[in-house]
């Protein structure tokens, strides 16, 4: 199990191993120099942190944890650029400090905002201060309304049924399916309908919808390259390489989205002139909430706020569901436990059709599915949607473990690494075990959000957490109620790709058998 769990780490690109002809002494020398610089930076950072007078006075003393990483070594510092350092941590106390205790001193910062601006704009995930507070207030209200909850549940069920139909056709012909692609399209269709009030139909093969979805995904990947390329601004100025491609993808996204916003704004203007009924999608709600007294609509603001929600919802749920099915295939007994729980909670009967089953899949039934909730949470522990989360320090600070932080420094906490730390989760931290989330009565028990950080914590905790769980539970319940899933080939190696979110690399080929 541990070998499988570490496989993703072992597949990082390498050169010169085992007599590979690509080996070069010059390359080895460069690699050695980089390693030496990294080690020296780490050593000096630790020495400096432990030597600061104020830091030493505030330094916490931790007892050793058997079988785990000593807490004193769960935070380290590396030199990023001249005058700026990055601090990385897996310490829940530090996470709590930056996300809640000293929240005003940490945020996205100008560096992240500048890198993400072309796609995220001034949306909620790329801004701080009053802009963030305003959007948070509007979005928080909408995500708690009964109308949106009912509307989104209907959309989730409709798209889960469409996905089940696609799976049924493949199962009847004994064909394997790429579930990563299917889930990406199904969840994109769902969130797009909820956000914009229009069916994208990528699961059915709509040309325009798929073109938008492809451009949308590509733009996210090209944005990530900016973190790795210090010369991205020059490339953007010259309109070459990845920046040229990113510009093309953003153009496709913007043309599609602005057309929808203008059409919806005109529709609402005409509708409100006749009656006071409102639509349930987020775009309509935001238009009504942000339109000025003079009737002016800020299309750019609406584009940013709604696209940010689409980005968060689509990537988190599709990726998590893909990892969930992968782990369920590795642990067939988990599938059967979920099936038994779903059947008991819905009480739909063995012969129920998909429509009859969806009718029985009420909020009350979903709330009874503690084991399914635990299995999804265990998936997020091992494969969080965002594997590395960064903040920028706005004022000099000292962390609870004694590290000094200067204004402008980056502070990173690592959900992926934290989910695999033995000092946090025990000796079986690498194992997929949903039972760790259940009490002796089989009832789901939540962990501290500063230990289980998949949804952030503090004032910026994910407002769509319940929304995401509801979508994942509906999709998972429908799929496992009607099908048994297996990996196409047990030897298929599944690892992650480098991106803003922790998605499965390449495809996830599964076979399905109707129950």
Please identify what each model-predicted range represents.
Residues 2-134, 155-166, 249, 391, ...:
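N-terminal membrane-proximal hinge/A-helix region immediately C-terminal to the signal-anchor transmembrane segment
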Residues 67-74, 255, 259, 357-403:
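Conserved cytochrome P450 K-helix E-x-x-R motif and the immediately C-terminal K′/meander segment
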Residues 187, 191, 249, 253-257, ...:
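Central I-helix of cytochrome P450 enzymes
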Residues 332-334, 411, 465-503:
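Cytochrome P450 heme-binding "Cys pocket" and the immediately downstream C-terminal segment
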């Amino acid at each position: 199990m541990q070998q499988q769990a570490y496989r993703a780490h072992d597949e990082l690109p390498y050169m010169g191993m085992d007599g590979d002809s690509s080996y070069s002494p010059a390359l080895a020398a460069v690699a050695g120099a980089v390693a030496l610089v990294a080690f020296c930076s780490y050593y000096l950072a630790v020495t400096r942190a432990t030597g600061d007078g104020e830091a030493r006075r505030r330094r916490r003393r931790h007892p050793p944890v058997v079988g785990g990483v000593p807490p004193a070594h769960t935070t380290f510092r590396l030199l990023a650029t001249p005058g700026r350092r990055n601090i990385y941590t897996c310490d829940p106390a530090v996470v709590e400090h930056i996300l809640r205790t000293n929240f005003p001193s940490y945020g996205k910062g100008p560096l992240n905002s500048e890198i993400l601006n072309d796609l995220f704009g001034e949306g909620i995930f790329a801004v701080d201060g009053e802009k963030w507070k305003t959007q948070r207030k509007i979005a928080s209200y909408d995500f708690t309304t009964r109308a949106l909850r009912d509307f989104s549940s209907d959309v989730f069920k409709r798209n889960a049924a469409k996905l089940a139909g696609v799976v049924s056709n493949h199962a009847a012909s004994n064909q394997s399916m790429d579930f990563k692609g299917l889930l990406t399209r199904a969840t994109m269709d769902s969130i797009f309908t909820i956000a914009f009030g229009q069916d994208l139909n990528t699961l059915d093969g709509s040309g325009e919808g798929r073109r938008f979805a492809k451009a949308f995904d590509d733009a996210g990947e090209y944005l990530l390259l900016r973190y790795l390329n210090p010369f991205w601004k020059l490339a953007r100025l010259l309109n070459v390489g990845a920046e040229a491609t990113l510009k093309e993808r953003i153009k496709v996204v913007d043309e599609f989205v602005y057309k929808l916003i203008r059409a919806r704004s005109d529709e609402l203007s005409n509708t409100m002139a006749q009656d006071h009924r409102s639509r349930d999608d987020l775009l309509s709600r935001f238009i009504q909430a942000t339109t000025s007294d003079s009737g002016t609509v800020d299309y750019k603001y609406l584009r940013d706020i709604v696209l940010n929600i689409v980005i968060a919802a689509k990537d988190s749920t599709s990726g998590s569901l893909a990892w969930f099915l992968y782990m369920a295939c590795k642990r067939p007994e988990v599938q059967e436990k979920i099936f038994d729980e779903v059947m008991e909670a819905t009480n739909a009967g063995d012969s129920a059709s998909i429509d009859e089953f969806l009718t029985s899949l009420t909020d009350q039934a979903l709330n009874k599915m503690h084991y399914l909730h635990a299995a999804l949470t265990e998936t997020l522990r091992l494969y969080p949607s965002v594997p590395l989360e960064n903040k920028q320090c706005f004022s000099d600070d000292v962390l609870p473990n004694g590290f000094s932080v200067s204004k402008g420094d980056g502070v990173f906490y690592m959900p992926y690494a934290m989910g695999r730390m033995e000092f946090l989760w025990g000796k079986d931290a690498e194992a997929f075990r949903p039972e760790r989330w259940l009490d002796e009565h089989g009832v789901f028990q939540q962990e501290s959000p500063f230990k289980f950080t998949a949804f952030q914590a503090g004032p910026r905790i994910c407002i769509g957490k319940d929304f995401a769980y509801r979508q994942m539970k509906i999709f998972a319940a429908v799929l496992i109620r009607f099908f048994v899933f297996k990996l196409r080939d047990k030897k298929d190696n599944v690892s992650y790709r480098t991106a803003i979110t922790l998605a499965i690399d390449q495809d996830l080929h599964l076979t399905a058998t109707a129950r």
